[in-house]
């Protein structure tokens, strides 16, 4: 089985606007997780993430700066497989499904922010395979 994770983090002090966008990305990822429930459509999970980004003045839809692609994809035998957490995918979430949860923010030529983790569906709802980023300067929660 295949998977991957992505972390955007800073080695030094960030511009305050970029740091705000990092937090918007984290909120969008959490919104997608919170919306993932048995029977919810894949596109509704995508919409939850996009709604957060819209509330931060990004997008809408696939407009930039904002989220230019899907919120997530199935994971398993292939690193990217269906179903997809994207507008138009009406597949209902079911126990046993596994997904990436990776909304990202892009402003071409300027910056990008992505936090990618994996979730799986249980009979009770979504659960994390990977632990979401802790902070912009300590992505794995291991400050030394």
State what each model feature region is.
Residues 1-144:
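Active-site neighborhoods and metal-handling regions in enzymes and metal-associated proteins
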């Amino acid at each position: 089985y295949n998977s991957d994770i992505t972390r955007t983090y800073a080695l030094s002090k960030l511009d305050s606007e970029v740091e705000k966008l990092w937090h918007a990305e984290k909120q969008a990822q959490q919104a997608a997780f919170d919306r993932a429930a048995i029977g919810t459509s894949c596109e509704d999970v995508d919409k939850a993430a996009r709604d957060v980004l819209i509330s931060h003045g990004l997008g809408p839809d696939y407009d930039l700066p904002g989220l230019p692609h899907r919120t997530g994809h199935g994971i398993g035998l292939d690193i990217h497989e269906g179903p997809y957490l994207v507008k138009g995918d009406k597949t209902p979430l079911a126990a046993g499904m596994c997904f990436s949860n990776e909304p990202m923010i892009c402003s071409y030529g300027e910056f990008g922010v992505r936090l990618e983790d994996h979730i799986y569906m249980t009979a009770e709802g979504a659960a994390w395979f990977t632990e979401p980023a802790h902070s912009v300067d300590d992505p794995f929660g291991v400050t030394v």
